[in-house]
Amino acid sequence: MLENRVKTKQIFIGGVAIGGGAPISTQSMTFSKTADIQSTKNQIDRLKLAGADLVRVAVSNEKDALALKELKKVSPLPLIADIHFHYKFALIAAQSVDAIRINPGNIGSKDKIKAVVDACKEKNIPIRIGVNAGSLEKQFDQKYGPTVKGMVESALYNAKLLEDLDFTNFKISLKASDVIRTIEAYRMLRPLVIYPFHLGVTEAGNLFSSSIKSAMALGGLLMEGIGDTMRISITGELENEIKVARAILRYSGRLKEGINLISCPTCGRIEANLVDMAGKVEKRLSHIKTPLDISVMGCVVNALGEAKHADMAIAFGNRSGLIIKEGKVIHKLAEKDLFETFVTEVENLAKEREKTLN
C-alpha cells in the first residue's frame, strides 16, 4: 500500500526544494578531483543530461575548496560540498556552494560545528547531517557500535546541536551498507524530527548489487512516505546512479514518468525473439517522458490480458504479431515489420497524451 508522504520542513538547495511535499530529487557525486574544474564540469554535465537534480563534490583539500567558486559559475546543477575531517574547508566552501554536507563522526568539536553553522547562516545555505554507520562519533560508537540505535542517537544529538545554535536549515541522512539497518534507522528517526531525509544505502557495491539493495531499502521507505531526496551509491558510471534512482521512484509510485515495460520471462511457448525485441523497445523509447504502460509479450497466453490494461502492446504469434492500442487491435503485421511500426505508434500516443495533459 502506498502511504501518504510524511510532511517535513522544506529547505532549498539552490532552486531545488527539498521536503515539504516537493518532488523527491535525485543526486549523485562526481569522482574527479574537484580542483580539476573542467573534468568536474564534464561529469556534472553528464549528470544533468541523465536527469539529476543536484550534484555533490568532494572537498579533500584547500585546493578543492578554493576551486568551488569557479566551479559554481559553470555548474548547471546546484552544488553540494562534501566535507570530512577539515571544518575549515567547509568555511571556504560555504562562500560559493548551495549546500554543505558534514559527517558528524569526523568534523570535530562543537566549536568547529558552530563555525560551519555560522558560515552557512551568513550565506543562507543548508547543511546535511550525514550520519554513517561506519564512522559514528566515538561516544556513540563505543556505546552502541555501528547499529541503528547508534545512528539515530548521533542524528538526534547533532540535530539538537544545530537547533541550539538557532539553525534549522538542514536535512538528515542515516546511511549503512545494508538494507535492514538502513530501513530501520530511517523508520526509527522519522517520527522524532521534522527535517527532510536524504535517503541512500552507502557503499552499496556495483550496478547489480547496488540496484537490488537500493530498490529494497529505498523503495520500501518511499512507499511508506519516507524520503525527500536520494542518491544511489554505485561503483560504476555516474549516469547509472540517476537511472536507477528514477526507476525506483517510478516503481514505488513517487514519479509518474516514462515507459513502464511489461514483458514476459519467456518459456517454450514464445514465438519470437522476445529478449531482443524487449531490449530494442526499451532502448528506443527511453526518451519518452510521458507515463505509459507498454507490454511486449511472446505468446497469446497472457498477451491479450496484459494488452487490455496496457497503453500499447505487442502480442506475438507465429512469425507475426498484433499491435494493440488501449485494448484495441490496430495492426496485424509480419514479425519483421512490427518493431518500427510499434515505436511509431507509441511515440504518437505519447504526443497525444502530452497534448491532453497540457
Swiss-Prot record:
<dbReference type="InterPro" id="IPR011005">
    <property type="entry name" value="Dihydropteroate_synth-like_sf"/>
</dbReference>
<dbReference type="InterPro" id="IPR045854">
    <property type="entry name" value="NO2/SO3_Rdtase_4Fe4S_sf"/>
</dbReference>
<dbReference type="GO" id="GO:0051539">
    <property type="term" value="F:4 iron, 4 sulfur cluster binding"/>
</dbReference>
<feature type="binding site">
    <location>
        <position position="267"/>
    </location>
    <ligand>
        <name>[4Fe-4S] cluster</name>
    </ligand>
</feature>
<feature type="binding site">
    <location>
        <position position="306"/>
    </location>
    <ligand>
        <name>[4Fe-4S] cluster</name>
    </ligand>
</feature>
<keyword id="KW-0479">Metal-binding</keyword>
<feature type="binding site">
    <location>
        <position position="264"/>
    </location>
    <ligand>
        <name>[4Fe-4S] cluster</name>
    </ligand>
</feature>
<comment type="pathway">
    <text>Isoprenoid biosynthesis; isopentenyl diphosphate biosynthesis via DXP pathway; isopentenyl diphosphate from 1-deoxy-D-xylulose 5-phosphate: step 5/6.</text>
</comment>
<feature type="binding site">
    <location>
        <position position="299"/>
    </location>
    <ligand>
        <name>[4Fe-4S] cluster</name>
    </ligand>
</feature>
<dbReference type="InterPro" id="IPR036849">
    <property type="entry name" value="Enolase-like_C_sf"/>
</dbReference>
<keyword id="KW-0560">Oxidoreductase</keyword>
<dbReference type="GO" id="GO:0016114">
    <property type="term" value="P:terpenoid biosynthetic process"/>
</dbReference>
<keyword id="KW-0408">Iron</keyword>
<keyword id="KW-0411">Iron-sulfur</keyword>
<dbReference type="GO" id="GO:0046429">
    <property type="term" value="F:4-hydroxy-3-methylbut-2-en-1-yl diphosphate synthase activity (ferredoxin)"/>
</dbReference>
<dbReference type="GO" id="GO:0141197">
    <property type="term" value="F:4-hydroxy-3-methylbut-2-enyl-diphosphate synthase activity (flavodoxin)"/>
</dbReference>
<dbReference type="GO" id="GO:0005506">
    <property type="term" value="F:iron ion binding"/>
</dbReference>
<dbReference type="Pfam" id="PF04551">
    <property type="entry name" value="GcpE"/>
</dbReference>
<dbReference type="InterPro" id="IPR016425">
    <property type="entry name" value="IspG_bac"/>
</dbReference>
<keyword id="KW-0004">4Fe-4S</keyword>
<keyword id="KW-0414">Isoprene biosynthesis</keyword>
<comment type="similarity">
    <text>Belongs to the IspG family.</text>
</comment>
<protein>
    <recommendedName>
        <fullName>4-hydroxy-3-methylbut-2-en-1-yl diphosphate synthase (flavodoxin)</fullName>
        <ecNumber>1.17.7.3</ecNumber>
    </recommendedName>
</protein>
<dbReference type="InterPro" id="IPR004588">
    <property type="entry name" value="IspG_bac-typ"/>
</dbReference>
<dbReference type="GO" id="GO:0019288">
    <property type="term" value="P:isopentenyl diphosphate biosynthetic process, methylerythritol 4-phosphate pathway"/>
</dbReference>
<comment type="function">
    <text>Converts 2C-methyl-D-erythritol 2,4-cyclodiphosphate (ME-2,4cPP) into 1-hydroxy-2-methyl-2-(E)-butenyl 4-diphosphate.</text>
</comment>
